[in-house]
């Protein structure tokens, strides 16, 4: 019997996105770019988001199709770029992701969460 972990993966994504936004709260871009500890915390959050996205893509293709507006592949791609090209991380892109993409992702996740129990995935 396979356990449905979809809600768990989505919650990991929500928590990591919320954490990343919290880590940079009150920081300017210059402060973020000079703060290695915050950079590392945000990067780890992005890896968690990408890993959960990958799990959802691999195990719940119907859910992915139904929620095609969520940037599942982009999240996986960012995770792969960070994990496999660690010495080449562009922290300006990371900053833009946290300030632009993650608030939007949090809104999208609140919508897709309501669909988790609607159908068996």
Locations of regions flagged by a protein language model:
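Solvent-exposed interaction patches of small proteins and small membrane subunits
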Residues: 1-121
């Amino acid at each position: 019997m396979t356990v449905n972990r979809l809600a768990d993966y989505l919650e990991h994504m929500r928590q990591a996105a919320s954490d990343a936004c919290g880590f940079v709260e009150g920081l300017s871009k210059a402060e973020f770019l000079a703060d290695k500890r915050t950079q590392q915390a945000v990067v780890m959050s992005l890896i968690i988001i990408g890993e959960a996205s990958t799990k959802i893509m691999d195990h719940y293709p119907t859910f992915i199709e139904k929620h095609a507006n969520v940037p599942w592949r982009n999240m996986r791609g960012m995770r792969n770029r960070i994990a496999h090209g660690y010495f080449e991380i562009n922290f300006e892109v990371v900053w833009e992701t946290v300030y632009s993409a993650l608030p939007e992702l949090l809104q999208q996740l609140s919508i897709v969460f309501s669909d988790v129990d609607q159908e068996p995935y």
